[in-house]
Amino acid sequence: MIDHLKRTKIIATCGPALTKSLVSLKMLDDNEYAAIKKVAYANIEAIIKSGVSVIRLNFSHGTHEEQQVRIKIVRDVAKAMNIPVSIMLDTNGPEIRIVETKKEGLKITKDSEVIINTMSKMIASDNQFAVSDASGKYNMVNDVNIGQKILVDDGKLTLVVTRVDKQHNQVICVAKNDHTVFTKKRLNLPNAQYSIPFLSEKDLKDIDFGLSQGIDYIAASFVNTVADIKQLRDYLKLKNASGVKIIAKIESNHALNNIDKIIKASDGIMVARGDLGLEIPYYQVPYWQRYMIKACRFFNKRSITATQMLDSLEKNIQPTRAEVTDVYFAVDRGNDATMLSGETASGLYPLNAVAVMQKIDKQSETFFDYQYNVNYYLKNSTANKSRFWHNVVLPLTKKTVPKRKLVNSAFKYDFIVYPTNNINRIYALSNARLAAAVIILTNNKRVYTGHGVDYGIFCYLIDKNPNQLTKAELIELAWKAINHYQAYGDLEKLKQCLAVYNETIINL
């Protein structure tokens, strides 16, 4: 039996599979939708109970009111459960999509000529279709060259450019395979320098809306340079929202060329393997995933692995063995969080997908090489320069190392309780990959919901400034928090617990 609180975080994308047909706030108060509302609330409660700590909202789809409904449901449920849940806004970003096709789509045959209209709103027909970005102002003819590949619908259709007609705003291509394309399907231009602005008008409106709703994270699509991060940070500062964390989505070869700088400039990265696998050879993706996770550990940043982790669970109950291995080794490599996209947004079995991911994450934590973690990562991480690291984090890491890495019962401690509002110290505790869950006592609501991505961190809201607690108050609150998370994690029997008071480790 695996009896410990899962420390790897799960990010679940919220969509109709979870919140059903609820698309307006009025529907929540309408008795006609009472049954649907009950199911939606039950779904969110179930996935939080199964270990979801971040709800991702994909702003490539849905209206603001639809997303507001989802935020309200999540906040209502999280408050009732007394469990912090972070909200992540995923930007639309600079992407190109097919404008419109007929219901049956547009069938493209191998070796046929395909004409892409770059400044038109035409409905696709006769081997022609139109493309646009979110603003409707982007002209793709400026970003392509003869001989270049264009990938459509996640690479399911490959086109090669044979001619660029700037006068008529057309890109003429030859199809390399058969495929049927549909409305809103994405286009990728591998290795192209896109002339689309990093933050479109739509992105800024979405971000403004998200800030009004108190989001915790922005997953910024198609980050290519440090300048992209700076542009977004400056905008957040202008909006008095510097506390919102930026997760850079790595989706292009240009981003990989700047990867260390991007990691250092952001609060964390998302290995967005879908688009990345189209922009670079797919067989290079595992290497870069490992590199980015390792670099995030080194720079004390958060890492998320995303895209098709349990893709088959959109339609099936059982995951493929390859998917199980994928999730397992993402955690084993040192990921902070594993993410579900279509599995929970539009899949048939969203609750099952979360439950499956929870089991795999916990299993990987059980066999994680904690001794290697001490010997290597703690010596190489940039976080080891701080006094707190040497006085608290390193001793805790050594103290909690299991005696035998392959035996779950060798976990000696269940919880470590630390009172703080210091984000950098929370990051240090998370990055250490302690063999116990860390409960942060905080009176800051931004801190309370702001660490849903951080490995091993569980926040507990208190009334008093955590830095002003007496030792007796700390011990009393520590046990309240421990009992709360013991119940949340369905832990039958507590092992030993620790607390940190004035940088001194004490047994509870």
UniProtKB/Swiss-Prot annotation:
Entry cofactors: Mg(2+); K(+)
Class of the enzyme per the UniProt entry, highest EC level: transferase
Domain of life assignment: Bacteria
Record-marked site positions (Transition state stabilizer): 249
Ligand binding (K(+)): 58, 60, 90-91
Binding sites annotated in the UniProt record for ATP: 58-61, 97, 185
Annotated binding of Mg(2+), by residue: 251, 275
Residues the entry annotates as binding substrate: 56, 274-275, 307
Protein name, per record: Pyruvate kinase
Protein species of origin: Mycoplasma genitalium (strain ATCC 33530 / DSM 19775 / NCTC 10195 / G37)
